[in-house]
Amino acid sequence: CDRRQRQMCIRDREWLVNFKNETHNHPTEIEPFGGAATCLGGAIRDPLSGRTYVYQAMRVTGAADPTVPVSQTIEGKLPQKKLVREAAHGYSSYGNQIGLATGYVKEVYHPNYVAKRMEIGAVMGAAPRRAVQRLNSDPGDKIILLGGRTGRDGIGGATGSSKAHNTKSTSVCGAEVQKGNAPTERKLQRLFRREEVSHIIKKCNDFGAGGVSVAIGELADGLRIELD
């Protein structure tokens, strides 16, 4: 299509639209910057694995009164002021790095959120229907791991949200929150947006906190992995 016809061509195409929301209440509670950043990054990953391009986002949060003096912080908790400020910085940082506009932000304040913060990120993605295929795997198909470096946080990071915590946990548990890599995820978005790339992919999973056993294990009934 030329420029004058482009708008009409877009209307005439069949499109796939993905909606995804992600809650990062616990990660943001223990490490607010990283927890909120990877809330957005994790929400983007799922539509990306479906080969759709994420183009808009929404953020909804819940916190107790951030003006309460730090001296009144409950033992074992981070101050509400720290949670509110650093979570906002983390979410914004990731969005700015990856180039995603958040068109709607809602902050809810209620005393009950002192028990645990609410951090929700939601996104929408879209791709031309002709660019995406979802097929069963066949013998001889290749599995490719593509993306940034994955450390121990990306292999077993999800376990941190399931174990018991106490008043001393906040001194060490922040390290369990996964570290985001927005520039690399941005490169993957741009790669998958190319139809000649997207169209040759039969199946795709995002490499979440469940690690390689989940991301690869779901692709076929049986497979061989040579992982260095």
What is each of the regions a protein language model found here?
Residues 1-10:
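Single conserved hydrophobic/aromatic residue that forms the stacking wall/gate
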Residues 119-129:
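Short, structured beta-strand/loop micro-motifs enriched in basic residues and often containing a Trp
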Residues 128-150:
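Acidic/histidine-enriched ion/cofactor-binding microenvironments in catalytic or ligand-binding pockets
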Residues 148-160:
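Short, Lys/Arg- and Gly-enriched loop/turn segments at beta-strand edges
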